Every structure is written in C-alpha cells, then in structure tokens.
Amino acid sequence: MESPKYAIVDLETTGHSHQNGDRIIQIAIVIMQDWNIQTTYTKFIHPGKSIPIFIQELTHITDEDVRDAMPFEMYADKIYELLSDCVFVAHNADFDLSFLQAEFRRVGLPEWHGKKMDTVELTKIMFPTAISYKLSDLAAELQIPLKQAHRADDDAYATALVLKKCWEKMMTLPLVTLELIHKRSFRLKS
C-alpha cells in the first residue's frame, strides 16, 4: 500500500470572505509523501481588483506584485490536479479550502472532494502546552524556519514541517494513546 500524499496549502487573499468578493492573491502547495517534500508549487494570482492596504501591509504583496500575474482560471486545472490524490492540509484548513472551493466553482470545476487535515487542530492535540497556535508562534516554538509569515510559500513550507513534527511526536506515543487520539479525532471541528 502506497503511503498517503499530503498537499500542504496556503493562500493569501484580499480579505477574509470569498462570499463578499475577496479573492486569492498567492497560492503555495507543498506536496509531501513519506514525510519528504516531493514538489512545491507557488503562484501569484491576479485578483481582478486592488489589494487593500491592510492586506498589502500584512502580506507584503502589492498590486505591483500581481500586476502581471494570471487570474485564477489560468491555474485552476493545475491546482485541482495537484490536490486530486492528496490529503488536503492547511493551518486553518476550513479557510483555505473554502476559498479554493469557491474559486473552483467560479471557474466551472467540480468541488474538490477528499480528506482534509487542519494543523491548528492537530497541534492542539500534539502540543497542548504551546503558548499559541498561530503559525508564526508554533514555528518559533518548534524551531521551524519561517522567513516571512503571511507569504503563502513560506507559510506552506512551515506548515509542512509542523505536520512532520506532529507525526514525529505521534510516533513516540503508546498505542493506547494513539487509539484514543484516533477515536476522538472524529469529533474535531475540521
């Protein structure tokens, strides 16, 4: 049996609500199998509108950065293909997946179906004494490099390493504990 492939995804967007017209401005996907990074995919995406100033300040992604980028529909098939046989992983998976699903619908692709994993929820189980579950704080605590928070490429890479750290910690736990985690994992929000 082949080991699972994970697509660790991070998006930067023009805001928090695809329902209100916010759009993706950067996507990064890290494909990991057997706890090794197989490939990475990163694109700036033209949102079809100006990036709000507070988003530019948060992400350091400007209108100039996306001016010559293609719109999502030019990348949609490739993104869909990358996710097709993977477990979808993100730090706050509901946010990233809901944005992607909205974009897939908008360009006429079917909704993506598959397993998903939220590293926020996973780290709450594996590192219950962490000071914070913000990606930048976890990265610092777990000694994971994070060059620039709120850049999709750096965040996706750090999230991949957080996932790997969770797996490494899981492998140190007794079987009875792993069975309890598995049983209770079905009640997690994600």
What are the functions of these language-model segments?
Residues T13-G15, E121, A158:
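Short, glycine/acidic-enriched loop or turn micro-motifs at the edges of active sites
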Residues E121-K124, A140, L161-K164:
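Generic alpha-helical structural context detector
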Residues R151-K164:
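Acidic, divalent-metal-coordinating active-site segment for phosphoryl/phosphodiester hydrolysis
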Residues M1-G114, P128-H150:
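Conserved non-catalytic scaffold segment of RNase H-like nuclease domains
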Residues I24, M74, L122, A156-Y157:
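Short secondary-structure boundary/hinge segments and terminal tails
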Residues M1-E2, V162-S190:
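Acidic two-metal-ion nuclease catalytic site recognized across multiple nuclease folds
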Residues H113-T123:
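A short, structured active-site edge motif that brings together acidic residues
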